[in-house]
């Protein structure tokens, strides 16, 4: 299928590109909003007909006590937030699977599980993770894990367990990265993505805006993502949730239209990736969320919490999707 790109009110058939420059991406980000939305709509309707939104539920399996110093994260042991550290606690397998079953009953398509780790370590906790992945897949759900860095062997074992996707965000641009985290390099993140891909697991990889970065930084982040070949299958776009006790606690909320611009540009750059409207959605309001759906977001996190931050409840999201006129799995599950 050919994707249509609008330029100067004309249509040009294009293929997926993996050679974007930062200047090109910045030009997209800074276009007049109506032009940007129009172009994103053309790409989205052509590449992803039907306007169907994937619902992903997210559970924090192991919360707090992380060795990383991510400036935005209340789970870091370096930050003085009120998230209780649980460095040795793993939620029991049966409890996780009960939550997954409840998410499916509510209409979720994907169940995501998070561990606040710098890296996966072999042992009982990893074996429990594998069992959880297998159990989630047996329920008929896609399974996604986020747990930091991993080895090639661990990636292979996760693939054998049936893991659908592994989440490992880039967070921000290579240029701004050391302002946000110093305990892991950008290259280590890229290498983790390569190991995931080599194991045959799909990539879930995106970033966060609102951390003090510039428009050029946002363009650079999107450029790195769009030049991954093939594109990440899922691209979460997060707005900073400034949590008390973290170094970024005093930053203002993200301008909702900046989230709309990020979603629209991601859609144009990565036509068939699932662009997931992720953290910070509660701060956007109904109208901005609908604009994000119009701009090409075709996945949301579904449920009342995202790891350690709040999220709209199921009833609110069902009303939102109905008002926007988009389709999701919960409609069929209620029939």
Curated annotation (Swiss-Prot):
Q: Which domain of life is it from?
A: Bacteria
- Drop me one GO molecular function for this one: biotin synthase activity
Cofactor dependence is on: [4Fe-4S] cluster; [2Fe-2S] cluster
Can you quote the record's cofactor note? Binds 1 [4Fe-4S] cluster. The cluster is coordinated with 3 cysteines and an exchangeable S-adenosyl-L-methionine.
Cytoplasm keyword on record: no
Q: What is its EC number?
A: 2.8.1.6
Please name the GO terms of the biological process aspect recorded for this protein, alphabetically.
biotin biosynthetic process
Task: Please give the family membership noted in the entry.
Answer: Belongs to the radical SAM superfamily. Biotin synthase family.
The record's NCBIfam families line, in alphabetical order, gives: bioB
Q: Record's PANTHER family?
A: BIOTIN SYNTHASE (PTHR22976), BIOTIN SYNTHASE, MITOCHONDRIAL (PTHR22976:SF2)
Q: How does it assemble?
A: Homodimer.
> What does this protein do, in the record's words?
Catalyzes the conversion of dethiobiotin (DTB) to biotin by the insertion of a sulfur atom into dethiobiotin via a radical-based mechanism.
Instruction: Quote the protein name from its UniProt record.
Output: Biotin synthase
> Native species of this protein?
Prochlorococcus marinus (strain MIT 9313)
Lineage of this protein's species?
Bacteria, Bacillati, Cyanobacteriota, Cyanophyceae, Synechococcales
């Amino acid at each position: 299928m050919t994707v249509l790109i609008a330029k100067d009110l004309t249509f040009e058939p294009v293929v997926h590109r993996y050679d974007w420059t930062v200047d090109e991406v910045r030009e997209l980000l800074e276009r007049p909003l109506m032009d940007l939305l129009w172009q994103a709509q053309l790409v989205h309707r052509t590449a992803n007909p039907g306007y169907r939104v994937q619902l992903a539920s997210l559970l924090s399996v192991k919360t707090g006590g992380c060795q990383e110093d991510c400036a935005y994260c209340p789970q870091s042991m370096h930050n003085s937030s009120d998230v209780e550290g649980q460095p040795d606690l793993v939620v029991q397998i049966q409890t996780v699977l009960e939550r997954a079953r409840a998410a499916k009953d509510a209409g979720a398509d994907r169940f995501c599980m998070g561990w606040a780790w710098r890296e996966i370590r072999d042992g009982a906790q990893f074996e429990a993770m594998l069992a959880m992945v297998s159990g989630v897949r047996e329920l008929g759900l896609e399974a996604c894990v986020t747990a930091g860095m991993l080895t090639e062997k661990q990636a292979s074992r996760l693939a054998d367990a049936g893991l659908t996707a592994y989440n490992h965000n880039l967070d921000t641009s290579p240029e701004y990265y050391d302002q946000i985290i110093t305990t892991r390099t950008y290259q280590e993140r890229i290498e983790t993505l390569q190991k995931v891909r080599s194991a045959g697991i799909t990539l879930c990889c995106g970033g966060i805006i609102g951390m003090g970065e510039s428009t050029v930084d946002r363009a650079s982040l999107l450029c790195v993502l769009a030049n991954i070949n093939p594109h990440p299958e899922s691209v979460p776009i997060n707005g900073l949730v400034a949590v008390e006790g973290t170094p970024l606690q005093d930053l203002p909320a993200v301008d909702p239209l900046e989230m709309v611009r990020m979603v629209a540009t991601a859609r144009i750059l990565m036509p068939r990736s699932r662009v997931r409207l992720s953290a910070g959605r509660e701060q956007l309001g109904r109208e901005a969320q609908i604009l994000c759906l119009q701009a090409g977001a075709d996945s949301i996190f579904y449920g009342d919490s995202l790891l350690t931050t709040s999220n709209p409840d199921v009833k609110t999201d069902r009303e939102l999707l109905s008002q926007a006129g988009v389709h999701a799995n919960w409609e069929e599950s209620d029939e």
